[in-house]
């Protein structure tokens, strides 16, 4: 697991060909996940960041990509979804449908998609 995190962290640093969105991981399905490095901030013991799931084809609602705004707590390895933006175009382009419904705290497994994203952010802070 440690080797996987080191590999992912090195990818996080080197894959900056998407502008501010940095590719972190691909799922077994048809999604690629990114973190917006420019959005990272730490405040009062929490980390805040935007992440994105970019699909190869539209989902059942016609969305190609979804951006998520997270609040994370590295010490307890937990996070909340603070906002979602659903886009009909790839890489979050175009006008998106915004949902500001905040979730409860989630304790992801380190191997899950959101767990890997949180691990990458926590490695920076």
Task: Provide a role label for each language-model segment.
Residues 4-15:
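Sec-dependent N-terminal signal peptides
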């Amino acid at each position: 697991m440690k080797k996987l995190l080191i590999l992912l962290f090195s990818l996080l640093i080197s894959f900056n060909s998407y502008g501010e969105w940095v590719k972190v991981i691909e799922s077994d399905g048809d999604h690629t996940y990114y973190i917006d490095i420019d959005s990272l901030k730490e405040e009062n013991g929490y980390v805040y960041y935007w992440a994105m799931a970019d699909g190869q084809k539209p989902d059942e609602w016609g969305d190609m990509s979804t951006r998520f705004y997270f609040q994370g707590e590295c010490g307890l390895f937990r996070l909340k979804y603070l906002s979602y933006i659903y886009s009909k175009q790839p890489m979050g382009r175009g006008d998106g449908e915004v949902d500001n419904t905040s979730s409860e705290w989630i304790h992801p497994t380190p191997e899950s998609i959101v767990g890997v994203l949180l691990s990458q952010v926590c490695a920076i802070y």
